[in-house]
């Protein structure tokens, strides 16, 4: 612990919370048919009515609501009990499950104060949220971006990349027989794993071949390998976890410099487990695991007698408990200047944030002619523009 932090404890000076940034994973969901379902999946044609593929289950809805309750309990004194538009920013990816997860977190985080109660029978109030369309999203889904794809392909085609991937050849052969799916990239292991997670969470009985490889075992190892290889170079870290870190950091610096446009207290980002893993990788805090449903990285900005500190909290989701993480080379309560030094090499530049997904078939199909006409050649998401 730093000298200032120790002295603060000795003389009884309290750290003053100034801002909170949160990136969290959506809740439990139904398997997503586009990438995850495999030909021999016994639930390939299962009727999940009234749910559609990829949507939140009731368990997932409750888990996100509980995340909101956790945030309310931990930060209630700081946030206050009255919602104001300028106090919170809420952004999600374009998936329905992340949009709904964001609404559920907000419902628990900001139940209506008596002053704001508009229906005595409903302990809820509407709160504005925003989302990024897939073709403009290099925050939650940067793996679609051309520069990321080029760099990852370079890594996978390198001698080292081929060697690391070949370590799972025995698993590959067995999985192809069991699933009927051709395994050609690390993502294939990843998608099979997450299909099994979703089906198990829903209460479905998994095939017997999963017993020795899931949730721990070779398939888990191959999925962890996917997280590792997709964050294995400085550029991949910049492009994957870097955009969120850049946004978090700009938000904090705006507070410190007094240039914050609105008096934001909390920024909520509703995304995916890949966002949790990539931010942990960028911070050199990742350990072999698959981030659980509703897991969250929380970055707190504190002030102790004029000196600013950063604290990182990992809400595990399952179980619903939190851990304070210590950045390598710093303390749990890390001086802001030291934090800035530690993350300097994983913050992307404007040029590295350039991401045009118009030529990705899936994204292009979702655009109207008018939208295609107006999309700029280079889409640069400048961190912190939602403050304006």
Swiss-Prot record:
Q: Which Pfam families match?
A: His_Phos_2 (PF00328)
Q: Which UniProt keywords apply?
A: Allergen, Disulfide bond, Glycoprotein, Hydrolase, Secreted, Signal
Q: Which residues are glycosylated?
A: 182, 228, 366
Any Gene Ontology CC annotation? extracellular region
Q: Which GO terms describe its molecular function?
A: acid phosphatase activity
Q: Where in the cell is it found?
A: Secreted
Name residues in a coiled coil.
Answer: none
Q: List the disulfide bonds.
A: 145-355, 330-334
The cross-references to Gene3D superfamilies, in alphabetical order and at most eight, read: Phosphoglycerate mutase-like (3.40.50.1240)
Record bears the keyword Glycoprotein = yes
Q: What is its EC number?
A: 3.1.3.2
Q: Which residue positions are annotated as catalytic?
A: 26 (nucleophile), 273 (proton donor)
What InterPro entries does this protein map onto?
Answer: Acid_Pase_AS, His_Pase_clade-2, His_PPase_superfam, Histidine_acid_phosphatase
Which CDD domains does this entry report, sorted A to Z?
Answer: HP_HAP_like (cd07061)
Just give the chief location class: secreted
Q: Catalysed reaction(s)?
A: a phosphate monoester + H2O = an alcohol + phosphate
Q: Where is the signal peptide?
A: 1-15
What is known about the tissue distribution of this protein? Expressed by the venom gland.
Q: Which family does it belong to?
A: Belongs to the histidine acid phosphatase family.
Record's protein name? Venom acid phosphatase Acph-1
Q: Which organism is it from?
A: Apis mellifera (Honeybee)
């Amino acid at each position: 612990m730093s000298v200032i932090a120790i002295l603060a404890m000795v003389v009884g000076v309290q750290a003053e919370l100034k801002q909170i940034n949160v990136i969290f994973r959506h809740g439990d969901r139904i398997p997503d048919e586009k990438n995850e379902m495999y030909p021999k999946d016994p639930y390939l044609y299962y009727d999940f009515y009234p749910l559609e593929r990829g949507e939140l289950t009731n368990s997932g809805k409750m888990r996100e609501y509980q995340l909101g309750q956790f945030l309310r309990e931990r930060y209630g004194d700081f946030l206050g009990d009255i919602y104001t538009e300028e106090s919170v920013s809420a952004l999600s990816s374009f998936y329905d499950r992340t949009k709904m997860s964001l609404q559920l977190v907000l419902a628990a985080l900001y139940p209506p104060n008596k002053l704001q109660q508009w229906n005595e029978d409903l302990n809820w109030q509407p709160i504005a949220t925003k989302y990024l369309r897939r073709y403009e999203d290099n925050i939650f889904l940067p793996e679609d971006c051309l520069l990321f794809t080029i760099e990852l392909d370079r890594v996978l085609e390198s001698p080292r990349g081929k060697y690391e991937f070949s370590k799972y050849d025995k698993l590959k052969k067995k999985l192809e027989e069991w699933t009927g799916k051709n395994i050609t990239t690390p993502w294939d292991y990843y998608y099979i794993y997450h299909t099994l997670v979703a089906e198990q969470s829903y209460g479905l009985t998994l095939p017997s071949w999963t017993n020795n490889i899931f949730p721990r075992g070779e398939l888990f190892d191959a999925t962890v390998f996917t997280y590792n290889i997709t964050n294995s170079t400085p550029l991949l870290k910049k492009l994957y976890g870097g955009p969120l870190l850049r946004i978090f950091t700009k938000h904090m610096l705006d507070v410190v410099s007094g240039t914050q446009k609105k008096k934001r207290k909390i920024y909520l980002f509703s995304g995916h487990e890949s966002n949790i893993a990539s931010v942990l990788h960028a911070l050199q805090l990742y350990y072999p695991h698959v981030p659980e449903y509703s897991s969250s990285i929380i970055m707190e900005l504190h002030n102790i007698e004029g000196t600013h500190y950063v604290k990182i909290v990992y809400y595990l989701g399952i179980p619903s408990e939190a851990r304070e993480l210590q950045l390598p080379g710093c303390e749990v309560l890390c001086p802001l200047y030291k934090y800035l030094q530690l993350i300097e090499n994983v913050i992307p530049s404007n040029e590295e944030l350039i991401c045009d997904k118009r030529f990705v078939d899936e994204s292009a199909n979702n655009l109207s002619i008018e939208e295609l006409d107006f999309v700029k050649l280079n889409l640069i998401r400048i961190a912190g523009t939602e403050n304006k």
